[in-house]
């Protein structure tokens, strides 16, 4: 039985403001689910509904098989880590860690045991007598996580806990979180707009947009088999190339070449083709199957160049394809020939935006 389950969850503020729409998903023990999406997609509202900080308009929330939809937060045995850490500035690290346990009136020996165990796991033993103002951002974040751990909850909820950290510290704390939650036996629900956090931390990802779950899957499936145009464009950096192409006789026309479309796909007059910049290959100029274009922009990313290539299409005008090229690769910086491996091409319905692959696989 799933430890956390959302069934047809909705939240309506006004007829025009509906941040959560028909969300149904489950998170088992030891699973790490990330709610990923842009600002305003409904991910934080969904987390607040799970926490009991807001009440759903309709739908059901269950934890451990028990319906908690209308239970107050204190009766759900959840622990939440906030973006702002939510530490008491006048308390020491020790006092912050044990404050929730004292409110639950646990015996002092048990409180001290739990706090000592968590302090050892998080490396906080030498900080126990300091106050938050005397700590770095990374240390404060570890204490916020520690406050959640000492509760021994049925579900962990984390609301963008790394967004206040600088890039280097965020990378280090992200690795710490991955190791830490791999040892926990309860579900984790994590909210972020950062796809790197979602891809590296999660066992599964729910991509949200406009209140709906666009795709719920393992991170590698989200990346390699996007269900629709939104997921394809939102997940991946640099962004996937998405080109609207004319079609005829089971081929799409791009520049001087025609690209075969799988025979099992229905083919209207136009389709949207997608391919990620890292999957495009440089071809020899004499290769007849290659697409030829002119380099319009080169961006140095360190290990790679991100190269924008103009492709002339006699029917639809000039199109831009972006390709990642290793920085140690020699290539013509003016004219370039490209190959699009068919196994890395995605096809999307121009009207619905849905992946054609998802219809047939």
Task: Mark where each language-model region is.
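A short, flexible loop at the N-terminus of ABC-type nucleotide-binding domains that lies
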Residues: 1-6, 10-22, 29, 71-75
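The feature captures the beta-strand-to-loop junction immediately N-terminal to the Walker
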Residues: 36-38
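ABC ATPase nucleotide-binding domain helices that frame the ATP-binding cleft
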Residues: 44-47, 143
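Helix-to-loop junction immediately C-terminal to a conserved catalytic motif
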Residues: 51
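Conserved ABC transporter NBD signature motif
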Residues: 59-67
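ABC ATPase nucleotide-binding domains
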Residues: 71-230
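Non-catalytic connector elements of ABC transporters
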Residues: 238, 251-361
């Amino acid at each position: 039985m799933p430890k956390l389950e959302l069934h047809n969850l909705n939240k309506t503020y006004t007829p025009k403001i509906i941040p959560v729409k028909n969300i149904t998903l489950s998170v088992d023990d030891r699973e790490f689910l990330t709610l990923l999406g842009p600002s305003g997609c409904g991910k934080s509202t969904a987390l607040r509904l799970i926490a009991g900080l807001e009440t759903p308009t309709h739908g059901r929330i269950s934890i451990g098989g028990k319906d908690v939809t209308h239970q107050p937060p204190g009766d759900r045995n959840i622990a939440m880590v906030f973006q702002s850490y939510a530490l008491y500035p006048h308390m020491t690290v020790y006092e912050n860690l044990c404050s929730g346990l004292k409110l639950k009136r646990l015996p002092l020996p048990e409180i001290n045991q739990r706090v000592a165990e968590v302090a050892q796991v998080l490396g906080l033993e030498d900080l126990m007598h300091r106050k938050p103002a005397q700590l770095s951002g990374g240390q404060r974040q570890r204490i916020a996580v520690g406050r959640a751990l000492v509760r021994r909850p049925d579900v962990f909820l984390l609301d963008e806990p790394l967004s206040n950290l600088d890039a280097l510290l965020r990378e280090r704390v992200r690795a710490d979180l991955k190791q830490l939650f791999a040892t926990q036996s309860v579900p984790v629900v994590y909210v972020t707009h950062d796809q790197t956090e979602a891809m590296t931390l999660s066992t599964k990802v729910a991509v949200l947009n406009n209140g709906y779950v666009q795709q719920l899957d393992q991170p590698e499936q989200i990346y390699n088999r996007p269900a629709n145009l939104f997921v394809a464009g939102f997940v991946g950096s640099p962004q996937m190339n998405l080109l609207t192409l004319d079609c005829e006789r089971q081929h799409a026309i791009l520049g001087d070449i025609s690209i075969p479309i799988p025979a099992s796909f229905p083919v209207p007059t136009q389709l949207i083709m997608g391919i990620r910049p890292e999957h495009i290959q440089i071809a020899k100029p004499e290769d007849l199957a290659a697409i030829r274009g002119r380099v319009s922009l080169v961006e140095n990313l360190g290990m790679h160049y991100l190269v924008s290539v103009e492709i002339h299409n006699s029917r639809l005008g000039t199109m831009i394809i972006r390709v990642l090229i290793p920085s140690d690769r020699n290539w013509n910086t003016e004219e370039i020939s490209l190959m699009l491996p068919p196994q890395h091409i995605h096809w999307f319905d121009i009207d619905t935006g849905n992946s054609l692959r998802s219809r047939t696989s």
